[in-house]
Amino acid sequence: MSSPIKKVLFIEPRAPRPHIFSRVAIPRIGPVLLGTILERQGLEVKVIIEEIAAPDYRSLDFKPDLVCISSITSTAPRAYELGDFYRRQGLPVVMGGAHPSFVVRETLDHADYVICGEGDEALPELVAALNSGGDLGQIPNLAFLAGETLRQNPWRPFLEDLDSLPIPNYEVVHGWNARRGRRFVSIATSRGCPFNCRFCAVIKLFGRKYRYNSVDRVMEEIRQNGAKAHHIFFCDDNFTADRERIKKLCQRILQEKIKIEWSAQVRVEAAKDEEMMILMARAGCYCVFVGLESINPATLKLYNKSQTVEGIKDCVVNFHRHGIRVHGMFVFGSEEDHYQVIRDTVKFSRDLDLDSLQYLILTPIPGTPVYQELEAQNRIFCHDWSHYDGHHAVFQPRRLTPYELQFETIRAMKKFYSWTSVLKRLIARDWFYVKMKAGGRIQMWQSRWGKSNHVQQLKERLFSRVQQLRQWLPGSNYVPRVGIPADIWKLGPWESSHRDFLLRFLRHLGVEVVQETVVDKTENGPLSQVQAEIARLQEKADLILLPFWQGLEEAKQKIKDAHQQITHETVARLLDLEFSRESFYNACMELGLCFQKRLRRIRRIYFQTLAEVGAEI
C-alpha cells in the first residue's frame, strides 16, 4: 500500500429495479456492522445504503482509502460498476456478501479482494495486513489474484460468540439523520439454519447450526437502535427457531415497557405455539414474513419443506387471530409446477386473505443446490445477474415454458394486487397496506412489467425457435401427414409412455401420423434401420419428424447427412426435435406451435393427452 488505510467507504448497491418494498428502505445489517467494527478500531467510516440515499460519488466529500462493496446476486452488476469506478481512481476495492462468496473469479475482475462468508474477522485482518504489508495468504475467507493465479484461502470456523460483536452504529449511514420518523432498522439475533431448502444458500454462508445472541444482548440493541426507530426488522433467517428464547425476549420487552413495532421472518411451524404468538403480539409484532413456498405437495417435498397445505392455512389464520399481519412468499417454477398450480395458488392466496405477498420465480442463485443442478443440465439461459431477483425466469422449467412461467407470475401478481384488494383495505382503514397494495399496483403499471424487455425476449425466444422449425414445413403451415421412423425410438431411452404420449399428442393436434418400419432387420443396427425408414417415408409423408432424445448429436447428424444423399429433391423434409425428461413439455409446446397458433390450446391438448396416457411424463 502506498498510503495507510484511515478512511473506509462501505456501499450497499441499490436493487436493479423497483420492488414491493422500495418505499420501505430497510438497510442490510452487514455493511453497518462491519463499518462499526472498523470504526471501533479507530478508522473513519461511512456507509452508503443506496436505497436510503445514493450520492453522486464523483462529488462525495468523503475521500476513502479503501472501498468495501456488499452484493447479493441481483445487485452484482451495480456492485461491479461501482468497483470499476473506484479502481479507475487507483483505490483498492473489497467485495463481499452472498454473490461474491460463490462467484469469486468473476468478482475479482471488478475488485482487488473478495471476502467469502462472514467478514467480521476477515475484513479487520485484511485492513491490518494491507497497512503492515502482512501475508494475505494467512487470512481465512479471503480470495485475491496473485498475478493471474486465483488464491482462495480456506474458510474459517463460524464465529460462535455473537455477543462479542459490537452493536451496529446506524449513525455511520449516509443520510441517516434525515430519516427521522421514517427509520427502519435491522437487528440480527442469530445466524445459521439447519433446514436445507434447495433454493437457499444460507447453510453455505452461515452454517447448519444455529448461533444465537443472548436475550440481554438483543435487549441492549433494541434499547440503543430500536427505540429510536419507526420499525424494527429482525433479519434472522428463522427468528422463532428457539421458541423459548423468543418468549423470553418478548417478556423482557413487556417488562421493560418498550413500545416498538417490529416484524420478523418465521417458518409455518411458528403458528403452532399459542403462547409465543400471544407474547409476540403483545410485544409489538406487526407482521411476520413466512415462506409459504407452494400449495403443491410435490413441490414442497422437492424444496425439502416439511409443511402441508393445511399447515399453511392454520399458520395464516392463527397469526391473524392474534392481530399479526402475514406477508406470504410463494415460489413458482419447480420441476413439479405447471400453469394450473400457479392459478390455484392465486385463488388460495385470496381465499386465505393474506395481507401482502410476493409471487416469486424460482431463481438459481449461485451457491444453491438448484443452481448446481440447473447449470449441470444446461438449463440456465440468462446470466444477466440483475434478473436474478426472483421476478424473472432465467432457466427452462420442466412443465412450463420460460415465457409461460413469467407470464403466469405477472398475471398472479396483478390478480392479488388488484384495485378491489386496495378498496378492501381502505374500508378496513388499514392505511399501511392500502399504501402497499396501491403502491404495488401502481408500480406494476408504471414499470409496464408485463411488457418489459425480458418478457418480450422470452416470448421471442419461444416463437423464434418455432419459426426455425416452421421453415422446414412444406408450402403451408398445414401438414396433414407426419412420418416418424418406427425404429427411431431405439436410439434413446424412450419409454413406452413417452412414445405413446407423443403419438397421441400429434393426433390431437390434427396431424395424421405415418410410421414406417423396416421388415428386414438385417440392417446394421437401429441407425441404419432409421435411415432406411426415412427413405420409405419420402412419398408417404409431408414432413418427417425425428424425435431425438437429448445427447444423440452424432446420430442426428449421420441421419441428416444420409437423408441428403437419399434424394435430390426432398419430398418430405426432416424436422428434428430434442427431448429429455427436463425438456419434454417445452419440446411439445414448440412442436405444437408448428401446427397450432394458440399456446393455450396446445397446452390444453398436452394435459388432455397426459390424462389419457395416465403415466408420469
Task: Cite the ranges covered by each PLM segment.
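N-terminal [4Fe-4S]-dependent radical SAM core
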Residues: S2-P4, V8-L9, R14-R17, L136-I139, ...
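Glycine-rich beta-alpha loop elements in corrinoid/cobalamin-binding modules
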Residues: K6-K7, V24, L34-L159, P364-G367, ...
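Glycine- and acidic-residue-enriched helix-capping/strand-helix junction motifs
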Residues: R17-P31, L491-H498
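Radical SAM enzyme core and accessory elements
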Residues: S2-F10, E39, L43-E44, R379, ...
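A short helix->loop->beta-strand "cap" motif at the edges of active sites that frequently abuts
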Residues: I5, R88-P92, I260, I324, ...
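Radical SAM [4Fe-4S] cluster-binding motif and immediate context
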Residues: D163, P168-F330, S334, Y339-Q340, ...
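Short acidic/histidine-rich motifs immediately flanking catalytic phosphotransfer sites
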Residues: D61-V67, A229, C285, E539-L543
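Flexible glycine/acidic-rich beta-alpha junction loops that bind and position SAM and/or redox cofactors
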Residues: R17-P18, G147, F195, E244, ...
